[in-house]
A protein has these predicted regions:
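Phosphate/NTP-binding elements of NTP-utilizing enzymes
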Residues: 45
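Active-site neighborhoods of divalent-metal-dependent phosphate/nucleic-acid chemistry enzymes
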Residues: 57-61, 69-114, 120-125
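Short, well-structured N-terminal submotif of metal-dependent ribonuclease cores
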Residues: 1-37, 50-62, 104, 113-117
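Helix-loop "lid/cap" segments that line or gate small-molecule binding pockets
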Residues: 48, 65-68
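A generic structural signal for short
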Residues: 12-13, 48-49, 85-86, 100
Length: 125
């Protein structure tokens, strides 16, 4: 399975937070899964850390590498798709994740039920 982690899912995984459900844990830990972390997620975390609004690992990039997650860059196509999405969700980072999941044929692991309103395949976190 090709999985894209929503920001909170990445942070829950790294913290071994019990908020992360069993289905999501199984998908992430499955050796047959390719697990992607978007540049948008890293950007969101770094912005919120700098503003003092979020506690996250100070070595986030190292943690992504240690977990063998694959980085997913943002492209012009992703940006255009994110901007053209219906207004179900106004968070620009979440809209980017939806666009990336659509364009790259990824399953989005998220705890946000609004994400599925875009028609992208999701797994509840």
């Amino acid at each position: 399975m090709r999985l894209l982690l929503d920001t909170h899912v990445l942070l829950w995984w790294l913290a071994d937070d019990p908020s992360l459900g069993e289905e999501a844990r199984t998908g992430i830990s499955d050796p047959g899964s390719s697990v992607f972390v978007s540049a948008a997620t890293v950007w969101e975390v770094s912005i919120k850390q700098a503003l003092g609004k979020l506690e996250a690992p100070s070595d986030l990039l190292h943690q992504v590498e240690l977990n063998r997650f694959e980085p997913l860059s943002m492209t012009v196509s992703h940006a255009y798709t994110a901007g053209a999405l219906p207004r179900h969700h106004d968070d620009p980072f979440d809209r980017m994740l939806v666009a990336q999941a659509m364009k790259e044929d990824l399953v989005l692991l998220t705890g946000d039920p609004r994400m599925s309103s875009y028609g992208v395949e999701t797994v509840a976190a």
